Amino acid sequence: MNREKTLVKNTAILTVGKICTQMISFFLLPLYTALLSTEEYGTVDLLNTLVSLMLPIVTFQIEQAVFRRLIDNREKDEEIKKIVSTTVCTILVQIIIYVVLFLLISPFINNDYKYFLLTNVMACIFSSIMLQISRGLGDNKNYAIGSFITASSTVILNVIFIVICRFGAYGMLMASLSGNILCSLYIFLVKKIYKYISIKKWDKQLLKTMWKYSLPLIPNAISWWIFNSSDRIIVTYFLGIGQNGILSASYKFSNLYITIYNIFNMTWTESASLHINDKDASDFVSSTMNVVLKLFTAICFGIIGFMPFVFPIMINEKFSDSYYQIPILMLATLFNVMVGLLSVIYIAKKNTKAVAKTSIMAAIINLIVNLGLIKFIGLYAASISTLVSYFAMAIYRYVDVQKYVKIKIDKKFLIVAFIMMPILLISYYINNLYLNIVMVLIVCLYA
């Protein structure tokens, strides 16, 4: 099977596993925003934000190393046992250290939800490790099923805990915890991970090699956390937890969009890693990037174009201020797509230091712009800082990766896209019914 067919096949498998439940979760947004207050919604979002910060710090990003290492050793059973054993044994020790430190610090944390920061971090670590082992072994089918179990069980339990039991924020956090536990158990049993685990197979030298790959990804992950999550903390501090709930609702549309891209990105990472040293690698990368960028630009413009019609249906009126942040976050996420396409080149070349460097620079830009503007323009500071930093990182990475592969982006496409962008934004904020209909028709023609 050639590279393109393999890429399409793997993407299709992962899409079935992820997009269905993501769509269900998305369409339950009116339910969540109706039954939860902005404060409750903001609290859940803030705790999930802290969980995402703790993950790379606790794991040293070793789940990324196990995936990359397994790709090169799929046919070597003994090497697989060594990689899995080293990863699992190491992560268990790291989790024990995290538990001890948390229990020492917890008496000083005055929050009703604090223990979810312990349990949800542990559950997310195990599900992430299991999923990356499955993916590293080339079993995208079970990776997709595991992801489906996480998402579907979380959605179902959210409905039970929030609608029936009326547990509020506790319900959402318990649902997330349960979903990750079920995913971990599924992969562990179906893939028979226990057969690969032996303390005797733990390898110190291998661990050093894996950490050499994964440690530079920690600042990268924290930088991504700054992009995606520090906004919430800054907004909560300066504007209040209710405004964080508004921002969280704004992100739901761009989060769905980037989820669709991330499904492709997983298979794109694998494909690029396998073929980065081919003679025609530059042509392969360029053609793939152009097709994907055109597709996701059309999707982005389509979401913005239809948003004036969809928003009143999807979002409760107490979250109405989130309307104004959505197009800015959508455009920021479009540049994030470009960043993701380019970052795969670094991963394929095992140059994780370059990934970290560019991410840190952009994260600093994000913080400076956000902190500099939030007192003057309020919630807009969070979305604008995200847009500026993603744009800066996309431009830098595009120039920087040329030393590995020569990438050419269709100039005609770029010109049309940059003409469409301001026209679409003007129409969105004027929010005139007839003008919105015209823009939807133009977007459809563009697509």
Model-identified regions with their sequence ranges:
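Signature of the first transmembrane helix
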Residues: 6-63, 99, 120, 150-155, ...
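Alpha-helical transmembrane segments of multi-pass membrane transport and lipid-handling proteins
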Residues: 23, 58-59, 64, 85-115, ...
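Helix-loop junctions and terminal segments of transmembrane helices
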Residues: 29, 58-75, 250, 254-290, ...
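Membrane-interface junctions at transmembrane-helix termini in multi-pass inner-membrane proteins
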Residues: 69, 124-147, 330-361, 401-405
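Transmembrane alpha-helical segments of multi-pass transport proteins
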Residues: 362, 410-447
